[in-house]
C-alpha cells in the first residue's frame, strides 16, 4: 500500500528530527528525503510533518507512523515463523528515562535479549517526555511519569523511583559547615542532569523556597556520570534509591534532608495490540519494576 522508500523517509525524519540527519541515515540527499515525504503527503492528501526544528509529526502523521510500525512488527513476527531468525530479527523501540535504565531496567534487557532473536532501539528522554515518543509512533512502549495514555494505548503502574538529596562527605564538610539551609544550598554547586530535569528544582523550591535559577549549577546529561559527580564531590543533587541507599548508610553519601524524599511515579505505556514476544517483554519489565521500585 505504501512505498517503502517514502515510508522510511517519513519515519527517519521524525526519529532524527531533521531532513539532513534522515538523509545521512538513509544515505541519500536531503532533497530526496524531502521529495519522498512530500510525495507521501500528496498521496495521503494531508500534511504529515511539521517542518520545524526539530521536525515533528502532525496528528495525522502520528497515526500513520503508528500504523506503519504495527504492520512492520506483525510482518516480522509472521516471517519469523518461516525464516531462520538469524536472518530476520524482530526489531522494536522503547522510550525510557536515564535513571530507570541505569537503576532497574538493564537486567530485564540483558535477560530478554540473550536469545539474539530481537533487536532493540532505546530512546532516552526525561520521564516527563518519554510518552511523546510513543504517541508519535517512534516506539511501542514507554516508561513515563504520565499516568494518562492516549487512544489505543494502555497503562500499568510500575511503582515509584525514590530520590534523596545527597552529597559526598568531603563536599558536606566544605560547603555545609553551617548546616543545610537556603544560603548554603544556594552558594554550593548543584548538579542538574539537563534542562528538562526538574527533580532538583522541585525539591529545593518545595523544601527551601529556593529557585534553581539562582543556584550555581553544573549540567551533566549522563546518569552514571551524574552519580559519580556526586560521589566525587563535584556537587550535590538528587540520588536514586535503592541503588545508592548503601552509600548513604555507610556515610559515603550524606543525606542532606533525612526526613524528606521525592518519589516519582512511573508507568509503562504500550500499544494495545502487541505480539507475544512483546507481551513477554512487557511482563518482565513489570515484574522487575515491582521488585525494585517503591509501591
Each model region followed by its residue ranges:
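A short LG(V/I)-centered, amphipathic sequence patch enriched
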Residues: 41-59
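Secondary-structure junction motif
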Residues: 186-210
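A late-sequence structural motif
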Residues: 258-295
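Central regulatory/effector-binding core of bacterial HTH transcription factors
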Residues: 88-151
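Short helix-boundary/capping micro-motifs
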Residues: 11-27
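Hydrophobic hinge/microswitch elements
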Residues: 210-255
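Alpha-helical linker/hinge and terminal dimerization helices associated
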Residues: 43-44, 64-86, 92, 285
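Flexible hinge/capping segments at coil-to-helix
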Residues: 155-191
Amino acid at each position: 500500500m505504501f512505498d517503502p522508500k517514502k515510508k522510511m523517509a517519513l519515519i527517519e525524519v521524525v526519529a532524527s528530527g531533521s531532513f539532513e540527519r534522515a538523509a545521512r541515515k538513509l544515505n541519500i540527499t536531503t532533497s530526496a528525503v524531502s521529495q519522498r515525504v512530500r510525495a507521501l503527503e500528496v498521496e495521503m492528501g494531508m500534511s504529515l510533518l511539521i517542518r520545524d526544528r526539530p521536525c515533528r509529526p502532525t496528528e495525522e502523521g502520528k497515526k500513520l507512523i503508528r500504523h506503519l510500525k504495527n504492520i512492520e512488527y506483525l510482518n516480522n513476527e509472521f516471517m519469523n515463523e518461516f525464516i531462520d531468525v538469524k536472518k530476520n530479527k524482530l526489531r522494536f523501540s522503547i522510550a525510557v528515562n536515564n535513571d530507570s535504565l541505569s537503576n532497574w531496567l538493564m537486567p530485564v534487557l540483558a535477560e530478554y535479549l540473550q536469545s539474539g532473536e530481537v533487536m532493540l532501539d532505546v530512546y532516552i528522554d526525561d520521564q516527563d517526555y518519554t510518552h511523546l515518543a510513543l504517541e508519535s509512533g517512534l516506539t511501542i512502549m514507554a516508561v513515563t511519569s504520565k499516568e494518562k495514555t492516549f487512544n489505543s494505548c494502555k497503562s500499568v503502574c510500575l511503582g515509584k523511583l525514590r530520590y534523596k538529596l545527597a552529597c559526598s562527605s568531603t563536599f558536606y564538610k566544605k560547603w555545609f559547615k553551617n548546616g543545610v539551609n537556603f544560603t548554603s544550598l544556594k552558594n554550593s554547586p548543584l548538579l542538574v542532569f539537563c534542562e528538562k530535569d526538574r527533580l532538583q528544582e522541585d525539591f529545593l523550591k518545595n523544601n527551601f523556597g529556593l529557585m534553581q535559577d539562582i543556584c550555581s549549577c553544573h549540567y551533566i546529561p549522563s546518569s552514571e556520570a551524574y552519580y559519580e559527580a556526586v560521589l566525587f564531590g563535584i556537587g550535590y543533587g538528587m540520588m536514586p534509591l535503592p541503588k545508592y541507599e548503601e552509600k548513604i548508610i555507610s556515610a559515603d553519601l550524606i543525606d542532606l534532608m533525612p526526613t524528606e524524599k521525592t518519589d516519582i511515579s512511573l508507568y509503562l505505556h504500550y500499544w494495545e495490540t502487541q505480539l507475544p514476544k512483546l507481551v513477554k517483554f512487557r511482563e518482565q519489565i513489570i515484574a522487575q519494576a515491582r521488585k525494585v521500585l517503591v509501591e
